[in-house]
């Protein structure tokens, strides 16, 4: 997954079309999340998907549709070339073994339950305040569009 993440990051910067660049960025976020998940950081992998893929990429596509950028192709890499470059690298990525130190560490707690316990006990007032702010902002956005 690290190899695919590196290639996806290069493609996100190097592709000419903004839409293709966003798709490469989404691929990068998903592969990093899978890498975090398989390394034992389950919560961080899930949060990576929720925050980056769910919010930032969709927001960027929404902004691109509002700006109405005209795309004039000036050459570049054909998608078939990209696929032909990536296919031979897949066996290298599958054969990659995670670091033994990460596998030897065993956790006796569930990090999701710890975060949930902290949110709903110690940080409960802040959670309520954030909920009220979100509701007021949604109502304000609806009121502004009328």
From Swiss-Prot:
InterPro entries: NADH_UbQ/plastoQ_OxRdtase_su6 (IPR001457), Nuo/plastoQ_OxRdtase_6_NuoJ (IPR042106). It is an enzyme of class 7 (translocase). Pfam families: Oxidored_q3. One of its GO terms (biological process) is mitochondrial electron transport, NADH to ubiquinone. Keywords: Electron transport, Membrane, Mitochondrion, NAD, Respiratory chain, Translocase, Transmembrane, Transmembrane helix, Transport, Ubiquinone. GO terms for cellular component: mitochondrial membrane; respiratory chain complex I. The chain crosses the membrane at residues 10-30, 43-63, 81-101, 124-144. Its EC number is 7.1.1.2. Core subunit of the mitochondrial membrane respiratory chain NADH dehydrogenase (Complex I) that is believed to belong to the minimal assembly required for catalysis. Complex I functions in the transfer of electrons from NADH to the respiratory chain. The immediate electron acceptor for the enzyme is believed to be ubiquinone. Belongs to the complex I subunit 6 family. This is NADH-ubiquinone oxidoreductase chain 6. It comes from Candida albicans (strain SC5314 / ATCC MYA-2876) (Yeast). The lineage of its organism: Eukaryota, Fungi, Dikarya, Ascomycota, Saccharomycotina. The gene is NAD6.
